[in-house]
Amino acid sequence: MENKHIPFEQLPITNKFMFAMVFSHKEIAKPFLEAVLGIKIHELRDPEPEKTIEVNPVSKGVRFDVFVKETGTSGETLRSFDIEMQMEDTKEIPKRARFYQAMRDSETLSKGEKYRNLKELYIIFICPDDIFGKGRAVYRFKNLETDDPKIEMGDLCFKNFYIFKKYRDVAEKSIRTYLEYFATSKPISPETEDIDRLVKWYQTDNNTRIRYMTWQEEIDIAVDQERQRADDAEKRANEEKARADKYEKMLRDLGKL
């Protein structure tokens, strides 16, 4: 779990706020995506840190850590990427990835638009611990036919999970250097040195400090609201149970049970 009491000037790259700030620079995000996905990217639009999507006021929304699109020569979207720094195993991360895909797709298609207009979507979670418990450092998922895994569903959605504490188990050096930096905060490549320089710059920037304080207040408010909703739900459940118990007792007293 993230420690919100870490002094601002010591915030590491694994802090959600710091991660979003640093990876909102496309010169940081592009080589990272190319390295961990093994692809070449034509051009990235400026990444959007803490991008929020809400389909309607009553449905659950989503806030992406960093959301970015690859564009072609005419500015058209080729692929989209959601990059998440996830320090806590909430036991629901795979289902969160499913929800993120649904929210992203619902925002992408306008009413009446063809499904074929959906582009490749990569959802990337960077975690300290192995949330699947299978001992791997990298998990890559896509939809395949159960009886014949050579047949791909072709929905163009890919969900990858990178376990940075297991960086020593990663064969690909391009991926390992990033995971090692997330685990140790020690840069060992030109790309991670660029990240580290930005981290240190943000740690000393007063405007970023103010922005972080506002962000932390919003997080605290959201946590309090979620806690209140949980308390209200528990209270309603207890009240319903009390009414049911009372009704059952009445029936027993009347000899109908």
Predicted feature residues:
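Generic amphipathic alpha-helical segments used as scaffolds and interaction surfaces in large
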Residues: 20-24, 165-169, 183-186
